[in-house]
Amino acid sequence: MAIKPLDESITSREAITSKADTAPRPTALIFDSGVGGLSVYQEIRQLLPDLHYIYAFDNVAFPYGEKSGEFIVERVLEIVTAVQQRHPLAIVVIACNTASTVSLPALRERFTFPVVGVVPAIKPAVRLTRNGVVGLLATRGTVHASYTQDLIERFATDCKIELLGSSELVELAETKLHGGVVPKEALKKILHPWLAMREPPDTIVLGCTHFPLLTEELAQVLPEGTRMVDSGAAIARRTAWLISSQENVISSDEENIAYCMALNADTDALLPVLQGYGFPSLEKLPI
């Protein structure tokens, strides 16, 4: 799934400022370590355009792929708690594969609202493969997570699963969203273990929410006809079902807002991008 522009009625600056969200709406928090979660947010908003959205990203501890599970759990709990103290949340989507693999139990134990996680789309990839070789492209944290191994054992016993962990690819996705160029040679170096195989994967699981941002660039490097699968659409459907199943949900008449953990030159440059996705303002979240 490549990042596609939303309808003009949603993304244009005029729409953001002139259609000040006046109808009360349930509040959904989308959280990621960086901007990759925008790929999941986009899928959710296409299904649920009338929610009140908060996008929070941890640009202080980014990237999460090399952090310990204990650190990630404590960090995510701290950030979600800080947002919840400022906004009545109806649902939280942890739009980060690495954080999802370790933090969901702790979040669900602490909070009463639904918490949705993102897991690698191994099951649908197994259905799509033609040569029986599926590649999982993720952060090293996700590749080595016990949850990922459980998914492979449950759904991929009849396939060969090739694992490739890369934090560099996360950085390249952030570079692209900030307006930078993604060098093809850098992608070739990252993907070399697969490109050098006699029979490389014909179906790739994009196991990090940053990676759909690079679908076009990856397609130029991977063998022709390689399919790329992510879990964004499935997460959107799950979110829609959970929202529709709730009763007496507290709603908000506030504008959409984005939170970061530190304001700097990078976040100044990112603000126009966030505005294009429907977040008129970006603030530092006190934690």
From Swiss-Prot:
The active site is at 96 (proton donor/acceptor), 208 (proton donor/acceptor). Pathway: Cell wall biogenesis; peptidoglycan biosynthesis. SUPFAM superfamilies: Aspartate/glutamate racemase (SSF53681). GO terms for biological process: cell wall organization; peptidoglycan biosynthetic process; regulation of cell shape. Substrate binds at residues 32-33, 64-65, 97-98, 209-210. Its EC number is 5.1.1.3. The keyword Cell wall biogenesis/degradation applies. Keywords: Cell shape, Cell wall biogenesis/degradation, Isomerase, Peptidoglycan synthesis. The keyword Transferase does not apply. One of its GO terms (molecular function) is glutamate racemase activity. It catalyses: L-glutamate = D-glutamate. Disulfide bonds: none annotated. InterPro entries: Asp/Glu/hydantoin_racemase, Asp/Glu_race, Asp/Glu_racemase_AS_1, Asp/Glu_racemase_AS_2, Glu_race. Belongs to the aspartate/glutamate racemases family. Provides the (R)-glutamate required for cell wall biosynthesis. This is Glutamate racemase. It comes from Yersinia enterocolitica serotype O:8 / biotype 1B (strain NCTC 13174 / 8081).
